[in-house]
Amino acid sequence: MAYPFQLGLQDATSPIMEELLHFHDHTLMIVFLISSLVLYIISLMLTTKLTHTSTMDAQEVETVWTILPAIILILIALPSLRILYMMDEINNPSLTVKTMGHQWYWSYEYTDYEDLNFDSYMIPTQELKPGELRLLEVDNRVVLPMEMTVRMLISSEDVLHSWRVPSLGLKTDAIPGRLNQTTLMAMRPGLYYGQYSEICGSNHSFMPIVLEMVPLSYFETWSAVMV
């Protein structure tokens, strides 16, 4: 869950988000080292008037600064490709939920059940209860079982939308006429908030997403009541 004036990323709740956090730290370390080296060289050039004539046309130096960037790019690309394949891999999901974007709300359908579907609207500010979050609460939360693989099928009824939950490392575009899919698996129970992340009109910022991850026994009870 995010908090005011937060500078870092949200705490990871899924294996994918854990991998993304590690990749972020890995890449940031490389960028920091390169930036420090460049700033050091620039400071030397500005504070000294010495010129190394032997390096002005050195074949060895040309070779080094051609090969070294290639190695650095490989060190960044390999873990990135691994995470991309992990995000696209879907093996025997335990549950499938179809998500449709509308102007300006989301609708959800649990395809493994005959009649389990609902719309999810943002709760207006004047109707919030004490302790609820402004512009983040919805009237119907998406209840899902924790520690189980859930497949989300995402599309749109009208314009481009985007379904995003930062704590789970999810962001999938909802495109009219196209069905995109992604998977999620939360490692612990709780409420996980997401916000709309596609400019599609005047009320695009009023389409929050709330996932309620619960134990399987609670989910079975909830689904029986909803059906």
Curated annotation (Swiss-Prot):
List the Mitochondrial intermembrane topological domains: 1-14, 88-227
Pfam families attached here?
COX2, COX2_TM
Provide Mitochondrial matrix-side residue ranges: 46-59
Q: How does it sit in the membrane?
A: Multi-pass membrane protein
Q: What is its EC number?
A: 7.1.1.9
Binding-site residues, Cu cation A2: Y196, E198, C200, H204
The answer, when asked if Repeat is one of the entry's keywords, is no
Q: Which residues cross the membrane?
A: 15-45, 60-87
Q: Which InterPro entries match?
A: CcO_II (IPR045187), CcO_II-like_C (IPR002429), CcO_II_C (IPR034210), Cupredoxin (IPR008972), Cyt_c_oxidase_su2 (IPR014222), Cyt_c_oxidase_su2_TM_dom (IPR011759), Cyt_c_oxidase_su2_TM_sf (IPR036257)
Please name the GO terms that the record assigns under molecular function: copper ion binding; cytochrome-c oxidase activity
Q: Report whether Metal-binding shows up as a keyword of the record.
A: yes
Q: Which residues carry this modification: Phosphotyrosine?
A: Y218
What is its cofactor? Cu cation
Disulphide connectivity of cysteines: none
Q: Give the binding site residues for Cu cation A1.
A: H161, Y196, C200, M207
Q: Might you report a single GO cellular component term?
A: mitochondrial inner membrane
> Would you identify the family this protein belongs to, as annotated?
Belongs to the cytochrome c oxidase subunit 2 family.
Job description of the protein: Component of the cytochrome c oxidase, the last enzyme in the mitochondrial electron transport chain which drives oxidative phosphorylation. The respiratory chain contains 3 multisubunit complexes succinate dehydrogenase (complex II, CII), ubiquinol-cytochrome c oxidoreductase (cytochrome b-c1 complex, complex III, CIII) and cytochrome c oxidase (complex IV, CIV), that cooperate to transfer electrons derived from NADH and succinate to molecular oxygen, creating an electrochemical gradient over the inner membrane that drives transmembrane transport and the ATP synthase.
Assembly, in brief, is: Component of the cytochrome c oxidase (complex IV, CIV), a multisubunit enzyme composed of 14 subunits. The complex is composed of a catalytic core of 3 subunits MT-CO1, MT-CO2 and MT-CO3, encoded in the mitochondrial DNA, and 11 supernumerary subunits COX4I, COX5A, COX5B, COX6A, COX6B, COX6C, COX7A, COX7B, COX7C, COX8 and NDUFA4, which are encoded in the nuclear genome.
Q: What is this protein called?
A: Cytochrome c oxidase subunit 2
Ranked from the top, the taxonomy reads: Eukaryota, Metazoa, Chordata, Craniata, Vertebrata
Encoding gene per record: MT-CO2
